[in-house]
Design a protein with these regions (language model features):
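Non-catalytic accessory regions flanking glycosidase/transglycosidase catalytic cores in CAZymes
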Residues: 1-110
Length: 110
């Protein structure tokens, strides 16, 4: 069986890494959005339903770019479903995670 080896030199640097490369994304997996970032009625939620404690921790991490939607969720995301009055937004089956997407958190809230 072939083998491979790798030698790393921690002292070797080509150039500094630009901070704008440290981005992240928001995905509707598990409780990342609903009951995570967005939870209307929670004691720590602001008037729009966003959790102020989660936002503070996110700011502390300091991502330079946050993409929404992100991850596998984007494969069947319809941006039109996440805008406009929440009561008029459709509920759909999220094909990525086989769950119901209420679209209560969408592009407008992001």
């Amino acid at each position: 069986m072939p083998t491979a080896s790798l030698i790393l030199d921690a002292a070797y640097a080509i150039a500094p890494v630009p901070r704008r490369l440290f981005g992240t994304f928001v995905e509707h997996m598990g409780r990342c959005v609903y009951t995570g970032l967005y939870e209307p009625g929670h004691p720590r939620a602001d008037d729009t339903g966003l959790r102020e404690d989660v936002l503070a921790l996110t700011r502390e991490i300091g991502p330079t770019v946050v993409r929404y939607p992100g991850g596998n969720f984007v494969s069947s995301y319809r941006w039109e479903d996440g805008i406009g009055p929440r009561v008029e937004r459709p509920t759909r089956l999220d094909l990525a995670w086989h769950s119901i997407e209420t679209n209560q958190f969408g592009l407008h809230e992001f």
